Regions:
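A short alpha/beta connector and helix-capping loop motif
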Residues: 41-76
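Conserved anion-binding
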Residues: 41, 61, 78, 86-181
Length: 183
């Protein structure tokens, strides 16, 4: 039977009790801890959150892997060095913001600091955005929801293209990088 990985996400926690919550999630059996970092452009409702200070603060409370999913338009060597030194095990980037040479440098920096690297295909980001990078990443995350216009509001519903996207991404991973995890 396939083991389903479970993460404890920290985006909406009480930061005054974050250490206790991480320890509780660890004891409950999560597979890894999911931290976030955001800037002033993406995720406007969670501006300037996360980063190496959070990872450094929670590292003593878990031996599980900690991943940092960034919602930014920039990621430099210093940021990667800081989160790695704080105890981060994987950096996850939005594929639509990091392409070409900048992504190649980021992948190399992650490897230099002993971290894994993942890419997220956000809402309506085409699979072709990771066509070259798939060879060098450890995880591909797919966001399979999109705007649902059934009631005229911006609700997040299941995208009609989701099943096809999942199938095509699985085929890409199987053909190009079978060690890459898909979520």
């Amino acid at each position: 039977m396939k083991h389903i990985k479970m993460a404890a996400g920290l985006a909406h926690v009480d930061y005054g009790h974050i250490a206790d919550l991480v320890a509780e999630a660890d004891a409950a059996g999560v597979d890894y801890i999911h931290s976030d970092a955001a800037d002033m452009h993406d995720l406007k409702n969670m501006q300037l959150m996360g980063g190496h200070q959070i990872i450094e603060g929670i590292r003593p409370y878990t031996k599980k892997d900690i991943e940092c999913h960034i919602y930014t338009r920039d990621c430099d060597r210093l940021f990667i060095e800081k989160i790695a030194a704080a105890g981060c095990n994987m950096l996850i980037l939005p594929a639509e913001h990091f392409l070409g040479a900048p992504l190649a440098y980021i992948i190399n920096y992650c490897r230099e600091f002993g971290m894994k690297i993942g890419l997220t295909l956000g809402c309506y980001t085409p699979l072709c955005f990771v066509d070259e990078a798939i060879y060098d990443i450890d995880r591909l995350q797919l966001v399979v929801h999109g705007v649902d216009d059934t009631d005229g509001k911006d609700n997040w519903g299941w995208r009609r293209s989701a099943v096809d996207l999942i199938r095509r991404s699985r085929e890409m991973i199987d053909a190009k990088n079978p060690k890459c995890r898909s979520e």
